[in-house]
A protein has these predicted regions:
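Short loop/turn motifs that connect adjacent beta-strands in outer-membrane beta-barrel proteins
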Residues: 21-32, 44-45, 73-82, 130-153, ...
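Hydrophobic, lipid-facing positions within transmembrane beta-strands of outer-membrane proteins
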Residues: 30, 64-70, 119-123, 154, ...
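Transmembrane beta-barrel strands of outer-membrane/channel proteins
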Residues: 32, 36-40, 84-88, 156-160, ...
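Residue-level signature of outer-membrane beta-barrel architecture
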Residues: 74-76, 86, 127-129, 160, ...
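Surface-exposed coil loops of outer-membrane beta-barrel proteins
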Residues: 98-115, 119, 132-240, 244, ...
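Outer-membrane beta-barrel "beta-signal"
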Residues: 121-134, 354, 423-435
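Signature for the C-terminal beta-barrel architecture of outer-membrane proteins
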Residues: 183-311, 315-322, 329, 340
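Outer membrane beta-barrel transmembrane domains
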Residues: 246, 261-291, 319, 323-412
């Protein structure tokens, strides 16, 4: 009897200690964060045999983009949170965001006007249902209230957000405001993820998260037109579905993650082959639009190699039968790189990144461009096909807490898959501040 009492008493003490530890760390009821990012890009003249409507301009160019975002959040009840993100954006991309499938500025996807524009980027509700396991403390961050959550949990997100907020994450290559800035490095370039011209959508996502694995699914709205700003309200007919499985592992005691993604988009997309059949010379894919499905998938791996060094790899594919609709004109992609913190040279918060990308097209897509067809981002009027290859490197200098300055270089071989144009070098500077 005394032994049972002692065990119960020890259990009571442990529970009290756990509660006391939780009391030492605050649980936020509301939060306010912000960011601003200024990116300037330059490329000089480069060789070209010809150009078309969607070509990268061969003469010298300098363009700048700016965004500023406010991240406001509030806890409604246990597990229930709401977030609002008003955003300011201004600027233009090189050549009007044309002429390179793996475009050079990941921030410009959110910029649709040279004038300063205020809009709502996100307004979403998140409900977390605890399923047990060790309690974890989550630090305060953008769109994340500080507090405790179960190691195993079910997370429901509903409203206006970005698909990239939830899917295809990567510790080393996902955020153009602080990491690599090429479009094909912020996510799987062959995933035509549902989004308006600013990179956001409406929809619902559900995540089952456990200590060693996670399963995610989402149903998201597509734009009404290719690369358009208004979303298609026919949600039962036009939408994008995505499923992702994530598995954590350790390689020689170093953490890593592998993610498998599959998607199917349903939208009013045209067919490359139908456009060619209707007009073998100068085909117009917009004349063949009807409700169609695009399918694809991707592999995403991240691996810590040392305390200050990590590596990543992505591979992506889609069927390439219907026109690119929401992101960019990439049907196959392979990318990989490394990220090194500056502790080895006395700059622990600095980051050096180097990555390579190889993008490709389906046979239908390349035949369409070779016949003089145009998409919403590439098309030189004719095509001497070659894979678009890009090398990107950046150095991020931590000035003070929250403020970083970056220098970025991108070398692009066969821009827009055309051996008759380029190569071209793009230099970028980035100023990023967050609180």
């Amino acid at each position: 009897m005394r032994r049972k009492v002692a065990i119960l008493f020890c259990g009571f003490l442990l529970a009290c200690a756990a509660r006391a530890e939780e009391a030492d760390k605050p649980e936020e009821t509301y939060s306010l964060h912000g960011q601003s990012t200024l990116i300037s890009q330059y490329h000089g003249g480069f060789p070209q045999a010809y150009s078309g409507t969607n070509s990268l301009v061969a003469r010298r160019e300098i363009k700048t983009s700016f965004t500023a975002t406010l991240f406001a959040g509030a806890r409604l009840w246990s597990g229930g949170e709401i977030y609002l993100n008003p955003e300011l954006a201004q600027g233009r991309g090189l050549s009007g965001v044309l002429g390179v499938a793996g475009f050079t500025n990941g921030e410009i996807a959110r910029v649709s006007s040279p004038d300063l524009t205020l809009y709502r980027a996100r307004l979403f509700f998140r409900q977390t249902f605890g399923l047990g396991g060790n309690r974890e403390y989550v630090e305060a961050d953008q769109n994340q209230l500080a507090g405790y959550q179960d190691g195993s949990r079910l997370v429901l997100t509903v409203g206006n957000f970005s698909a990239l907020d939830i899917f295809d994450d990567n510790s080393y290559s996902h955020e153009p405001r602080s990491q690599f800035i090429n479009w094909a490095l912020l996510t799987n370039g062959a995933w035509d993820f549902p989004a308006d011209a600013r990179g956001y959508t409406n929809g619902v996502a559900l995540e089952l998260i456990n200590p060693g694995w996670a399963l995610r699914g989402g149903l998201l709205m597509e734009p009404r037109e290719a690369n358009g700003l208004p979303l298609d309200n026919r949600f039962s007919k036009a939408h994008g579905g995505v499923v992702e499985l994530e598995r954590s592992y350790a390689l020689q005691d170093r953490p890593g993650k592998v993610r498998l993604l599959a998607y199917a988009n349903r939208a009013n997309m045209g067919s490359y082959r139908a456009a060619l059949a209707a007009s073998p010379i100068g085909p117009d894919i917009t004349q063949t639009r009807r409700l169609s499905t695009k399918r694809g998938g991707g592999l995403n791996v991240e691996q810590q190699l040392a305390d200050d060094l990590g590596a990543f790899l992505r591979a992506g594919w889609n069927d390439g039968k219907t026109e690119s609709w929401a992101f960019t004109e990439i049907d196959r992609t392979l990318s990989g790189g490394i990220s090194l913190k500056g502790a080895r040279w006395g700059r622990a918060n600095d980051v050096l990144g180097v990555a390579g990308i190889v993008n490709g097209l389906s046979n239908d897509h390349r035949d369409y461009l070779a016949a003089g067809g145009y998409g919403f981002i590439v098309g030189d009027g004719q095509l001497n096909y070659g894979r678009e290859s890009i090398l990107e490197s950046y150095y991020s200098l931590a000035v003070v807490k929250g403020l970083s300055l970056s220098l970025d270089y991108q070398y692009i071989q066969n821009p827009a898959y055309n051996k008759d144009r380029g190569p071209v070098s793009v230099w970028s500077s980035r100023i990023h501040y967050e609180f």
